[in-house]
Amino acid sequence: MSAEDILNEIKAAVINKAPGNAVITDVEFEGSEVVIYAKNPELFSNNLIKEFARDFRKRLAIRPDPSVLVEPDIAKDKILKIVPEDAEITNCIFDANTGEVIIESKKPGLVIGKEGSTLEDIKKAIQWAPKPVRTPPIPSDTIKAIRATMYRERADVKDILRRIGRRIHRDVRLRDDSWVRTSFLGGSREVGRTCLYHQTPESRILVDCGINIAVEDEKAFPHFDAPEFSIEEIDAVVVTHAHLDHCGFIPGLFRYGYDGPVYCTKPTRDLMTLLQKDYVDITEKEGKNVPYSSKDIKNCIKHTIPLDYGVTTDIAPAIKLTMHNAGHILGSAIAHCHVGDGLYNVAYTGDIKFEASRLLEPAVCQFPRLETLIIESTYGGYDDVLPERDETEKEFLRVIAETIARKGKAIIPVFGIGRAQELMLVLEEGYNQGIFNAPVYLDGMIWEATAIHTAYPEYLSKNMRNRIFHEGDNPFLSEVFKKVKNTNDRRNIMDSDEPGIILTTSGMLSGGPSVEYFKNLADDEKNSIVFVGYQSEGTLGRKIQKGFKEIPLMGKNGRSKAVKVNLSVHTLEGFSGHSDRKQLIKYLRKLKPIPDRILTVHGEVSKCIDLASTAYKLFKKETKAPMNLDSIRLR
């Protein structure tokens, strides 16, 4: 049966069972949902909606017909009249495709009203479905731009969703003897360019599609030359998190003809857009070939369908996706794919942290069903036991305090997302305790990434949420943090005799402001550089770690200049957003259910093999450390 035939059946059933005065105007597939448009959507009871969802075995959404929605300008005026001024409404964002209006305010409780009474008044007055949220304390240009794109291109976005819906909901029933296989196109026995390719007789799913920013040849990108891979056959792309080694090439897929959905959490959508734009800007400035443009990033945004943790969604014929917290960075997810009607279950961890941090809760380790687990191995080697976080924080603050005491500057190269915010929390506490007294400069994308963090407090740890909401203390707003707004600010910081701490991207000194700071501050022994994250082989960061005393770097005139390395060099591994060996093994021990097969990826050769070997000894299950271009039949 075609998707059109299925939709017609659903339409007939809805019209037959819906209240007569609901006035059904349309029923459509939009992405994974069946969307029912009605002039009086409030007449649909929760029981009737549940009955439809059970009968159709699909996610259901009831939305007001566009004709009954009050014009946004008039609707905003009505909202401001209904809601008490004390709520301090700062913005109203109207989404014509969903019929929702996001109401940002400093006191969302007043927008809700007693037992939701104010929300009901708003809905009756404007017909839009109100969604109150707390105003982010730091405005985000990225979120603003994404919302503007989605509003400006709303007609195109609706067409995209309907086209995707028809592809998802075509009638497909996998036989009991159907096969499931995964091809490893990148990130196997290496770190960088992560890309998995799940295949069934009816569907093709790409999970992550990253870039290895440490290399410049074809090894920077996944193996799109694999014989089984065809960009025209991809049904969906899933993104586990926003680091470039997992999401860096996704806009490139659109450049070369992909026209399907991208599934990720909302924070991942926003953060990956930020990183992709930054990657394009830096690559262009360095005169290198850029694999895609800002137009391709915009196209990616329009095709992105955000998912919440724990929500199961149809993403392709006979494949359902559920995303679970991975504990790595904001919005990071474990991608659990359910194939067929109980036929097979495979989960890919992405990058995981199985330990609570200041910022995030630990990774989820319990699933309804699981036959194959694909797990990262960044620190999977026998000797990869990282120091305890408390001890690492003390050592970090000691290095900072000593550097400031000798009137030096501490350069801390970091990924703009995740580790930067963790370190901000440590530095804020150290400053409050009087361990050091100097400004912390935030350069590169760190300020904007932090703004995005403040927009999604529900993804932060319970302790952070309590501190922000109940104690009224947002550490990201501390007076110690100073935004570096432009190159003049950067030059003034480098030329100043005053001590300071510089949090800057990129984390491996593969580009961005961190390289400029290093060039200008490396020869002064009063200064220090503190590595808090993994440094890939071949990067400037790895060379500094190895103790190079002189490093040739390109100057502004295009000529190579030898930079003397006199500053003190420190490496602190305990801040990693990855699980170390102990945490990885603990994760496998806690995993429920224990899968039949464990595959190790995302690590240097020895680390992937070591973790696979240990997993076999512990669980006596099939284990393997696949190589790039391997294909494994899972079922």
From Swiss-Prot:
<dbReference type="InterPro" id="IPR036866">
    <property type="entry name" value="RibonucZ/Hydroxyglut_hydro"/>
</dbReference>
<keyword id="KW-0862">Zinc</keyword>
<dbReference type="InterPro" id="IPR015946">
    <property type="entry name" value="KH_dom-like_a/b"/>
</dbReference>
<feature type="binding site">
    <location>
        <position position="602"/>
    </location>
    <ligand>
        <name>Zn(2+) 2</name>
    </ligand>
</feature>
<dbReference type="InterPro" id="IPR033769">
    <property type="entry name" value="TffA_KH"/>
</dbReference>
<keyword id="KW-0378">Hydrolase</keyword>
<keyword id="KW-0804">Transcription</keyword>
<keyword id="KW-0540">Nuclease</keyword>
<comment type="similarity">
    <text>Belongs to the metallo-beta-lactamase superfamily. RNA-metabolizing metallo-beta-lactamase-like family. FttA subfamily.</text>
</comment>
<feature type="binding site">
    <location>
        <position position="243"/>
    </location>
    <ligand>
        <name>Zn(2+) 1</name>
    </ligand>
</feature>
<feature type="region of interest" description="Beta-Casp">
    <location>
        <begin position="383"/>
        <end position="576"/>
    </location>
</feature>
<feature type="binding site">
    <location>
        <position position="351"/>
    </location>
    <ligand>
        <name>Zn(2+) 1</name>
    </ligand>
</feature>
<protein>
    <recommendedName>
        <fullName>Transcription termination factor FttA</fullName>
        <ecNumber>3.1.-.-</ecNumber>
    </recommendedName>
</protein>
<feature type="binding site">
    <location>
        <position position="246"/>
    </location>
    <ligand>
        <name>Zn(2+) 2</name>
    </ligand>
</feature>
<comment type="subunit">
    <text>Homodimer. Interacts with RNA polymerase (RNAP); interaction is not dependent on DNA or RNA. Interacts with the Spt4-Spt5 complex.</text>
</comment>
<feature type="region of interest" description="Metallo-beta-lactamase C-terminus">
    <location>
        <begin position="578"/>
        <end position="635"/>
    </location>
</feature>
<keyword id="KW-0238">DNA-binding</keyword>
<feature type="binding site">
    <location>
        <position position="245"/>
    </location>
    <ligand>
        <name>Zn(2+) 2</name>
    </ligand>
</feature>
<feature type="region of interest" description="KHa">
    <location>
        <begin position="4"/>
        <end position="69"/>
    </location>
</feature>
<feature type="region of interest" description="KHb">
    <location>
        <begin position="70"/>
        <end position="137"/>
    </location>
</feature>
<dbReference type="InterPro" id="IPR019975">
    <property type="entry name" value="aCPSF1"/>
</dbReference>
<feature type="region of interest" description="Metallo-beta-lactamase N-terminus">
    <location>
        <begin position="179"/>
        <end position="382"/>
    </location>
</feature>
<keyword id="KW-0806">Transcription termination</keyword>
<dbReference type="InterPro" id="IPR004044">
    <property type="entry name" value="KH_dom_type_2"/>
</dbReference>
<keyword id="KW-0805">Transcription regulation</keyword>
<dbReference type="Pfam" id="PF17214">
    <property type="entry name" value="KH_TffA"/>
</dbReference>
<feature type="region of interest" description="Metallo-beta-lactamase C-terminus">
    <location>
        <begin position="577"/>
        <end position="635"/>
    </location>
</feature>
<dbReference type="Pfam" id="PF07521">
    <property type="entry name" value="RMMBL"/>
</dbReference>
<feature type="region of interest" description="Beta-Casp">
    <location>
        <begin position="180"/>
        <end position="577"/>
    </location>
</feature>
<comment type="function">
    <text>Terminates transcription on the whole genome. Termination is linked to FttA-mediated RNA cleavage and does not require NTP hydrolysis. Cleaves endonucleolytically at the RNA exit channel of RNA polymerase (RNAP); the 5'-3' exonuclease activity of this protein degrades the nascent RNA released from RNAP.</text>
</comment>
<dbReference type="GO" id="GO:0005694">
    <property type="term" value="C:chromosome"/>
</dbReference>
<feature type="binding site">
    <location>
        <position position="351"/>
    </location>
    <ligand>
        <name>Zn(2+) 2</name>
    </ligand>
</feature>
<dbReference type="InterPro" id="IPR011108">
    <property type="entry name" value="RMMBL"/>
</dbReference>
<keyword id="KW-0158">Chromosome</keyword>
<keyword id="KW-0255">Endonuclease</keyword>
<dbReference type="GO" id="GO:0003723">
    <property type="term" value="F:RNA binding"/>
</dbReference>
<keyword id="KW-0694">RNA-binding</keyword>
<dbReference type="InterPro" id="IPR050698">
    <property type="entry name" value="MBL"/>
</dbReference>
<dbReference type="GO" id="GO:0004521">
    <property type="term" value="F:RNA endonuclease activity"/>
</dbReference>
<dbReference type="Pfam" id="PF07650">
    <property type="entry name" value="KH_2"/>
</dbReference>
<feature type="binding site">
    <location>
        <position position="328"/>
    </location>
    <ligand>
        <name>Zn(2+) 1</name>
    </ligand>
</feature>
<dbReference type="InterPro" id="IPR001279">
    <property type="entry name" value="Metallo-B-lactamas"/>
</dbReference>
